[in-house]
Amino acid sequence: MKIVVDENMPYVEPLFGDLGEIIPVNGRTLTPEQVQDADVLLVRSVTRVNAALLEANQKLKFVGSATIGTDHVDLAYLATRGIVFSNAPGCNATAVGEFAFIAMLELAARFNSPLRGKVVGIVGAGNTGSATAKCLEAFGIKVLLNDPIKEAEGDPRDFVSLETLLQEADIISLHVPITRTGEHKTLHLFDEARLMSLKANIWLINCCRGDVIDNQALIKVKQQRDDLKLVLDVWEGEPNPMPELVPFAEFATPHIAGYSLEGKARGTFMLYQKLCELLAIPATKGLSDLLPRFNIKAVELEQLPDEKALLQLARFVYDLRDDDAVFRNCFAKENGFDIMRKNHKHRREFSALALAYRGQSEVDWLSNLGFSGVGR
């Protein structure tokens, strides 16, 4: 069995090595010739999977995408061919939620404007939006959710209209899929008019898809509104973001919000489980077998952390400032965006860091944030 796999997908060899011949490829430049003999194709969001790519292949059984979204895959075409498809919904949700939360802590520190007391509006209450809300609510932050699709489906959570969210939120975090047509179109959901209407001193964080915000309009608005603070992990025109926009972002990164070691391993592992199910063989490998030990054994707390101390703990796990600095230095270089993604260091999730606390105060909120080992 030939398994063609994006070369940037981690843990493929230990998971799939016993199942067939692994053929690593560049996912962004993948050609029909490279997949014409594949039995299994494993991709990320940079690969367009459609008839043009697969028409020469008559033996493909399974396509797996280690992503939450599926907009890069022609699902209808795969169905007509009888090709089984699986993605990895939620695989990097924790990573994205923690990224957005850390970004808010960093902005709070940079502008001496505490996160506690602010209202955060989350647009899109799926896996990543829910993970962001979980972090915020654990820290005692009021969260407003907007997701008309989930609301219509009967999701029991409380939702508000986008207009209400824009009026009441001090921070907006975007977590919607890209939808180009229809009643709930998200393409340029934040156009020039909507960006100009945002309340004063708003923080806007985009961790979903670059073209949910009209980036050209965002440049124009930022030229007029210095009070609008931006954290951008995604960009229109990836892998070539508009260079004029980068200086306007407080933190800028190359679409790596979901790039935790845990999240990346989880995505590959979910595809391994699905392929084993398709092949009717037992999944003998475990996710816990893949992850290395964290380089900090534990942090002993003499007292529970305030907001500034929490940021220091978060930086033990992930320092957003480092990725921001690398991005500004490299994004304009040839293939810089993709090189940064490929060479992204092994960021961990909060769960990798154990905290030891023996005081009498309530510690559940630290556990709910995801830190491990919290106890009295």
From Swiss-Prot:
Substrate binds at S45, T67, Y259. Keywords: Cytoplasm, NAD, Oxidoreductase, Pyridoxine biosynthesis. GO terms for biological process: 'de novo' pyridoxal 5'-phosphate biosynthetic process; pyridoxine biosynthetic process. Pfam families: 2-Hacid_dh (PF00389), 2-Hacid_dh_C (PF02826), DUF3410 (PF11890). Coiled coil: none annotated. HAMAP family: PdxB. Homodimer. This is Erythronate-4-phosphate dehydrogenase. It comes from Shewanella oneidensis (strain ATCC 700550 / JCM 31522 / CIP 106686 / LMG 19005 / NCIMB 14063 / MR-1).
